[in-house]
């Protein structure tokens, strides 16, 4: 395991792990530092939402867990962490491609294809967040996907060229770090999050138990309370 600093984050780099989130879960709270990263270039059992698995070819993508210990963040506002991570990934990807959006709750899309997945687990003490373990997978240099996932895509497939992973890591963490500075400005984060929601404009096909239908998404905005400013 190697330790180094990148863009204000302390990185613990492992050659291979089953899951960076699972490794982070095993660490005692005393060893979890704010803006700490557990990174691997070979994740063998990456976890997605529910029972899903995250496919990542060895040495091709970003697989990491970012640990936050936000000061005095109320448990009721824990979604601020999700918005920080999702918007940080969106900001990074938007440097390379257009049409990047966030699909509720934690996926990042380019057009109709998924390029990044996020899995966040919180430890709560009383009314506040003790720590947040933010698992992040971003498809960077993968040339093809072998799982039955319906719509994955990588920057390599979109750009037609490989990107240097260490530089990509630095850029991604810099974007996440800038968004983390907004962690206590919930309304500001929420406004950006809603503006970049997947399919927030236009008419699309949707499906429910009655079949396929066409509709547009309507966002309902409410006036924030003074506490949310």
Segments predicted by a language model, with ranges:
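Structural motif
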Residues: 110-111, 208, 223
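Acidic (Asp/Glu) carboxylate-rich active-site/surface patches
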Residues: 10, 85-127, 137
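Conserved, helical-rich catalytic subdomain that frames metal- and/or nucleotide-binding sites
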Residues: 160-210
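Short, acidic (Asp/Glu-rich) active-site segment that either coordinates a divalent metal cofactor
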Residues: 127-157
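Short beta-strand segments
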Residues: 39-41, 65, 103, 119-121, ...
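Single conserved hydrophobic/aromatic residue that forms the stacking wall/gate
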Residues: 221-229
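N-terminal lobe of the biotin/lipoate ligase/transferase fold
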Residues: 1-95, 162
């Amino acid at each position: 395991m190697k330790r180094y600093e990148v863009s204000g984050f302390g990185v613990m780099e492992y050659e291979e792990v089953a899951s960076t989130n699972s490794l982070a879960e095993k660490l005692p709270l005393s060893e979890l530092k704010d803006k700490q990263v557990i990174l691997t270039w070979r994740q063998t059992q990456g976890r997605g939402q529910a029972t899903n698995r995250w496919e990542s070819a060895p040495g091709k993508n970003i697989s990491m867990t970012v640990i936050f210990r936000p000061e005095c963040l109320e448990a009721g506002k824990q979604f601020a962490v999700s918005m920080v991570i999702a918007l940080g990934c969106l900001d990074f990807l938007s440097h390379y491609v257009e049409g990047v959006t966030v699909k509720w709750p934690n996926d990042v899309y380019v057009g109709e294809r998924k390029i990044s997945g996020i899995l966040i687990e919180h430890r709560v003490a009383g009314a506040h967040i003790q720590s947040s373990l933010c698992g992040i997978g971003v498809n960077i240099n993968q040339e093809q996907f072998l799982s039955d996932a319906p719509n994955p895509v990588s920057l390599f497939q979109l750009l037609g060229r490989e990107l240097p992973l260490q530089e990509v890591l630095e850029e991604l963490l810099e974007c996440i770090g800038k968004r983390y500075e907004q962690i206590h400005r919930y309304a500001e984060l929420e406004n950006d999050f809603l503006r970049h929601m997947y399919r927030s404009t236009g008419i699309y096909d949707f499906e429910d138990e009655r079949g396929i239908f066409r509709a547009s998404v309507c966002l309902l905005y409410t006036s924030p309370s003074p506490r949310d400013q």
